[in-house]
UniProtKB/Swiss-Prot annotation:
F-type ATPases have 2 components, CF(1) - the catalytic core - and CF(0) - the membrane proton channel. CF(1) has five subunits: alpha(3), beta(3), gamma(1), delta(1), epsilon(1). CF(0) has three main subunits: a(1), b(2) and c(9-12). The alpha and beta chains form an alternating ring which encloses part of the gamma chain. CF(1) is attached to CF(0) by a central stalk formed by the gamma and epsilon chains, while a peripheral stalk is formed by the delta and b chains. This is ATP synthase subunit a. The chain crosses the membrane at residues 37-57, 96-116, 149-169, 187-207, 224-244, 266-286. Keywords: ATP synthesis, Cell inner membrane, Cell membrane, CF(0), Hydrogen ion transport, Ion transport, Membrane, Transmembrane, Transmembrane helix, Transport. It comes from Acidovorax sp. (strain JS42). CDD domains: ATP-synt_Fo_a_6. SUPFAM superfamilies: F1F0 ATP synthase subunit A (SSF81336). GO terms for biological process: proton motive force-driven plasma membrane ATP synthesis. The gene is atpB.
């Protein structure tokens, strides 16, 4: 055994669990050459799993008395469809947007639910599989800012697509320079208002996209940290003979937070889906 081998401190434990499995080592805060391989792999696997679950529900659906699984899926589909009708008034657009919203909800829920797994379970299995005791692995894709901003950026692109599709390229361009402050018959004032309106539109799009992704990331990142702290309580209990009640506190705290976190992961998936519908609905409206 190496002489410098030692059990990790609490800060080392947390820092290690916050490191991603990456294609290359990240050298700066913003580095687009870096790919978080764990986030990509887990999100793709969960996406396929979500598609399989919905396919299975459609495959096994019956017109008679539905099973509990079928009833749950039907309730989910009906909920999403009602929200889509409330926000997207174009029936043709809803044919794509409603299934998209359902996909977003199921996918994000599954990614959020990875936070309910024991903190060390998959990372330790990965270390055993690779033979590297210091291998990194994060299994909650939505606790990765690149994932959530990627999702919100995709929503932004769809907003652009539907703005052009519904209003035409000229109509959307006209809206960018005339809303929210309008225009003027005076060419000078019209130019000034056009620049101000365009800047306001850019700020609005950027703010909505960043807040859309940051809201999901912030909640899931905080939840991940809390689970790490609870796991540290268990580690402290194992190393302490005097802290008799610490293991009990670890179990109680972990159970309470897990139950509460089920609400959080569901609520965050719902909020992200609702904002997606709202933003796409706004893209259909004239300003």
């Amino acid at each position: 055994m190496a002489a410098d081998a030692h059990a990790p401190t609490a800060s080392e434990y947390i820092v290690h669990h916050l490191q991603h499995l990456q294609n290359i080592k990240q050298k700066s805060i913003i580095d687009f050459s870096v790919v978080n391989l764990d986030s990509v792999a887990v999100s793709v696997i969960l996406g396929v799993l979500g598609l399989f679950v919905m396919w299975l529900a459609a495959r096994t659906a019956t017109s008679g008395v539905p099973s509990r699984f079928q009833a749950a899926v039907e309730m989910l589909v009906e909920m999403v469809d009602n929200q889509a009708k409330a926000n997207i008034h174009n029936a043709q657009s809803r044919k794509f947007i409603a299934p998209l919203a359902l996909t977003v909800f199921v996918w994000i829920f599954l990614m959020n639910a990875m936070d309910l797994l024991p903190v060390d379970l998959l990372p330790v299995l990965w270390q055993v599989a690779t033979g590297d005791s210091h291998a990194y692995l994060r299994v909650v894709p939505t606790a990765d800012l690149s994932t959530t901003l990627g999702l919100s950026s995709a929503v932004l692109i769809l907003c652009f697509v539907y703005s052009i599709k519904i209003k035409g390229l000229g109509g959307w361009a006209h809206e960018l320079v005339t809303a929210p402050f309008g225009t003027s018959k005076n060419p000078v004032f019209a130019l000034i208002l056009g620049v101000v309106n365009l800047l306001m539109q850019i700020i609005e799009y950027v703010a909505k996209t960043v807040s859309h992704g940051m809201r999901l990331f912030g909640n899931m990142y905080a939840g991940e940290l809390v689970f790490m702290l609870i796991a540290l309580m268990g580690g402290a209990a194992a190393m302490s003979l005097s802290g008799v009640l610490l293991p009990v506190g670890h179990i109680i705290a972990g159970s309470i937070w897990a139950i509460f976190h089920i609400l959080i992961i569901t609520l965050q998936a719902f909020i992200f889906m609702m904002l997606t519908l709202i933003y796409l609905g706004q893209a259909h409206e004239a300003h």
